[in-house]
Swiss-Prot record:
Keywords for this protein: Ribonucleoprotein, Ribosomal protein
InterPro entries found in the cross-reference section: Ribosomal_bL19, Ribosomal_bL19_CS, Ribosomal_bL19_sf, Translation_prot_SH3-like_sf
HAMAP family per record: Ribosomal_bL19
Protein function: This protein is located at the 30S-50S ribosomal subunit interface and may play a role in the structure and function of the aminoacyl-tRNA binding site.
Protein name: Large ribosomal subunit protein bL19
Domain of life of the source: Bacteria
C-alpha cells in the first residue's frame, strides 16, 4: 500500500519544473484564474514566509503588502493551477518560518539580499 502511494506521488511530482527557493526569497507566482469560460494568468509577487515539505502535499506561503494591507496566500507546490514560479531575489534570513514579518511595517519588514 505504501509503495503504491509513493509511486503515485513520484509520478505526479516529476513533470513540474520548480526552482529552488526558500523562506526570505521574493518570488512571482503565475496562477491560472478561470473567469467564466476564459482562463488567464494572475501574478502574485511577494516574500516567501514559510515552506512546508510534505512530498506531494508540499506548500509555501507568500506575503505581500497591497495598498497598505498585508496579503498572504498559501500555494500548493504541485498544484495544476500554478503555471510558473520565478525567483526574483534571494533573501538572507536565519529562520525557516518568517511569521514575525506580520508584525513589522515599512523598512523593518525589509529583508537583506543574499550576496
Amino acid at each position: 500500500m505504501n509503495n503504491i502511494i509513493q509511486l503515485l506521488e513520484t509520478e505526479q511530482t516529476q513533470g513540474k519544473e520548480i526552482p529552488d527557493f526558500r523562506a526570505g526569497d521574493t518570488v512571482t507566482v503565475q496562477v491560472k484564474v478561470k473567469e467564466g469560460n476564459r482562463e488567464r494568468l494572475q501574478a502574485f509577487e511577494g516574500v516567501v514566509i514559510a515552506r512546508r515539505h510534505r512530498g506531494l502535499n508540499s506548500s509555501f506561503t507568500v506575503r505581500k503588502v497591497s495598498h497598505g494591507e498585508g496579503v498572504e496566500r498559501v500555494f500548493q507546490l504541485y498544484s495544476p493551477l500554478i503555471a510558473s514560479i520565478k525567483v526574483n531575489r534571494r533573501g538572507d534570513v536565519r529562520r525557516a518560518k518568517l511569521y514575525y514579518l506580520r508584525n513589522l511595517r515599512g523598512r523593518k519588514a525589509k529583508i537583506k539580499e543574499k550576496i
